[in-house]
Regions:
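Short glycine-rich phosphate-binding loop at a beta-alpha junction
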Residues: 214, 446-458, 684-695
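Conserved phosphate-binding catalytic cores of ATP/NTP-utilizing and phosphoryl-transfer enzymes
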Residues: 258-263, 311, 332-339, 363-364, ...
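Conserved phosphate-binding/catalytic loops in two-lobed NTP-binding clefts
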Residues: 455, 474-486, 703-727
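Internal gly/pro-rich beta-alpha loop/helix module
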Residues: 317-391, 590-594
Length: 739
């Protein structure tokens, strides 16, 4: 008997073919395996076919991800041996490209073994680890189709590459010091200071001296410095133009990390996972300079994920700040020449290598929210693995996402391929980067969209781009309301097929009525939605300025409550400015209405005198989250009239609360009570939580606790971010409803 199999999934570049080869040999089966653009095809014949099928799925390599298996039985054709055939490049692009994966333990042992030929070699990898997504130029995933094509393997590497019993069998980035990429160190003037081990040692010495070094990694450059050196960290802030936004810190090991932070068991597992994300963890007080994460209880911590990181940290006694190599709000730098031009104004030295990065890919960020890992940024280690839809699409869809924390998606059948993190598409550089990344992903999959979907906001650069693209290609353009897309995203990733109550809370999103939404209760299914409840709208004095200045939102709420008398409150404005802002508010000049819960967090933070200006998105909310005390059980009053949730009594209670330290807890408890109250009124069992506010751990935990004990099923995000980084999935899901 013969069996013909077709496997779709992330099975290329993970040691899958050698695994199948060894399994077939062990079971005395004959036939072949081949990589194709559709995935992997296998034909085997012999006696132990059922055992083969069972073990194929149970014992597959750790990184292999099987999306689907189809097989059929046939007559034997008389194969005499089992072989690995040459790959085919024709056909449609169905293969799942694997993300870049952190260095495995076996490779690490070799890097630090003085007797090994790869001792201290920064580009050591195998089929279980190393770069994938950032080096592949086209499918199928074979060495000539990667940026490793310029490095001809030496005899020893070639022998490993061709040996089906070796873990480097068909490891496309396989290399060693003799034949592979090398590192080079330059000063900011572009003069070469050293290469190889000397380059690394000079870079390490510079870090010890308090200098800043740009280091080329897997998906772009990092800017690194001694994380315990306050002066170095402050210098990096000034040069990078990053006032207070937290820096990530890389530790050499979990053991070292525990001297500075308190990870839970789940957070430890996330830190050590093959994806190696940055994980937001509670820090040990005063263990690191306050300037790393000013005013916050958590730090973004991560472990090394490339041999180069491990080598650098092995020769340092301290953790390092490792932040993206760019100016604030610009795309991460990935090319050597660009680094020498751009990063020389930030870094004192630049450590490059000569393996080209095909596409930039930032570090991923994860936070445990409500006891579940939530992706704050889905990028390296996760992208571009697809998310499965509950239904099949009839058309090929391109979704352009939102403006902030942008990701986009291409989708067909039941698969949504979400891009790596693009960033905030607010300037020319990020828009250009967005466009390059869209065309790159479409080209990689030979994808021609038949429908484009975007956000409804007329001023989003991604919306304007989608309009231009749809006209140029003469294909339909669909616009989806921002908060509906948030809830659709949560529904799609959880495989929900029926109606839900969606609670979409965030900073801002363009509403159907032309106002800014952000405190929404929506009854949703894939075909349509209804806005059933929302927070009472208030004016954002000065529009965009109010988003960056919580004191303006606080003033707006006080004016709603007290009218002109609010000007007599002790407010962080001079009298002249106050009177001008009152005029602007009363006449509605550049002061759009908003129902945003994110802005309510800003206002409360300002009313408490904690924060009047936000230096980065979500800063006030993060501070209030850190001040939450689970021992505080009570909440403030609120009222619901018609469809409107009135926050005015809540704000009055806050103003009269003499226990100021309990205000953040009582405010968060109030929001959870409102969620329960509305859920009961609507009466739909399934409740989806989405939007940037749902990154708040105590808030989500409290909402889940309240709703679950009252019989509701609560769904949150795990596969895509709850912030605008998950919008593109919701935009794709919207197309399901149309068909």
């Amino acid at each position: 008997m013969r069996i013909k199999l077709e496997i779709i999934g992330a099975v290329q570049g993970v040691g899958f073919r050698p695994f199948v080869y060894r399994l077939a040999k062990e079971l005395d089966l004959r036939g072949w395996i081949i990589n194709t653009p559709e995935g992997v095809k296998i034909e085997v014949e012999g006696e132990n076919l059922d055992v083969f099928l069972k073990r194929l799925q149970e014992e597959k390599p750790p990184l292999a991800y099987i999306y689907s298996i189809s097989f059929e039985y046939a007559e034997e054709v008389g194969y005499t041996d089992f072989e690995i055939k040459e790959s085919h490049s024709e056909g449609k692009r169905e293969v799942f490209i694997l993300p870049d994966i952190g260095t495995c333990d076996e490779c690490l042992k070799e890097v630090f073994d003085p007797k090994d030929r790869r001792y201290m070699y920064p580009f050591t990898n195998c089929t279980h680890c190393g770069p994938r997504f950032t080096i592949i130029e086209k499918l199928p995933y074979d060495r000539p189709n990667t940026t490793m094509k310029v490095f001809k393997m030496c005899q020893e590497c070639e022998r490993e590459y061709n040996d089906p019993t070796n873990r480097r069998f068909h490891a496309q980035p396989n290399a060693c010091p003799k034949c592979g990429p090398q590192v080079f160190l330059y000063d900011k003037e572009g003069s070469l200071l050293g290469e190889g081990e000397k380059a690394i040692d000079l870079a390490i010495q510079a870090v010890k001296e308090g200098k800043i070094v740009a280091v080329k990694g897997i998906g772009g450059f990092h800017l690194i410095c001694d994380a315990t050196n306050e002066k170095a960290v402050n210098t990096l802030r000034i040069r990078k133009r990053r006032q207070e936004k937290p820096f990530a810190v890389m530790f050499k090991s979990l053991q070292q990390l525990k001297e500075y932070a308190r990870p839970t068991n789940l957070e430890e597992a996330l830190l050590s996972s093959p994806q190696r994300p940055i994980v937001l963890i509670e820090k040990v007080q005063d263990s690191l300079p306050e300037t790393i994460a000013p005013g916050l209880k958590r730090i973004g911590a991560f472990l090394p994920y490339s041999p180069l990181h491990y080598i650098i940290l092995s020769k340092l006694d301290v953790p390092i700040v490792a932040t993206s190599g760019n100016y604030s709000e610009e795309p991460i730098v990935k090319d050597n020449e660009e680094a020498l031009n751009k990063l020389s104004e930030i870094a004192d030295l630049i450590l490059v290598h000569n393996r080209e990065i095909k596409r930039r890919c930032d570090d991923s960020v994860v936070k445990v929210v409500g006891g579940i890992p939530l992706l704050i940024r889905r990028s390296r280690g996760y992208a571009p693995l697809p998310v499965k839809l509950p239904y099949k699409l009839k058309n090929k869809v391109l979704a352009t996402g939102g403006m902030l924390k942008n990701t986009f998606a291409i989708a067909w059948d039941d698969k949504v391929f979400i891009s790596q993190h693009v960033g905030d598409v607010e300037n020319y550089q990020t828009l250009k980067s967005f466009e390059e990344m869209v065309f790159d992903l479409m080209n990689l999959y030979q994808f021609e969209p038949e429908i484009v979907v975007c956000d409804m906001h007329p001023r989003y650069e991604t919306t304007k781009w989608a309009q231009f693209f749809s006209e140029e290609k003469n294909i339909p353009l669909l616009k989806v309301q921002h908060h509906y897309a948030h809830i659709l995203s949560c529904m799609a990733e959880n495989g929900i097929e029926d109606e839900v109550l969606g609670i979409a809370w965030d900073g801002t999103g363009y509403g159907e009525d032309g106002t800014l939404w952000g405190g929404e209760f929506l009854v949703c299914h894939y075909k349509t939605y209804k806005r059933v409840y929302h927070f009472k709208p208030f004016r954002l004095i000065g529009g965009e300025k109010a988003i960056k200045e919580p004191k303006r939102v606080a003033l707006s709420l006080l004016l709603e409550l007290f009218g002109e008398k609010a000007l007599d409150f002790n407010l962080p404005f001079d009298r002249k400015e106050l009177e001008m802002l009152f005029k602007v508010w009363s006449k509605g000049i550049n002061s759009p209405f908003s129902s945003s819960v994110g802005r309510l967090f800003d206002a409360v933070c300002s009313l408490l005198g904690i924060r009047h200006i936000n230096n980065y998105e979500g800063q006030s909310a993060m501070i209030l989250e850190d001040l939450y005390n689970p021992a505080v059980k009570d909440h403030y009053s609120y009222s619901i009239e018609g469809q409107i949730i009135d926050w005015r009594t809540t704000i009055l209670d806050i103003l009269q609360d003499k226990e100021r330290e309990k205000v953040p807890s009582r405010f968060i408890n109030t929001l959870a009570k409102i969620a329960l109250d509305i859920a009961r009124r609507v009466g739909i069992e399934k409740v989806c939580l989405s939007g940037g506010v749902m990154q708040n751990d105590p808030l989500v935990s409290k909402i889940k606790e309240e709703l679950t004990k009252n019989g509701f099923l609560v769904y949150t995000h795990q596969k895509v971010p709850t912030n605008d980084g998950g919008l593109c999935l919701g935009q794709v899901a919207y197309v399901i409803g149309l068909s």
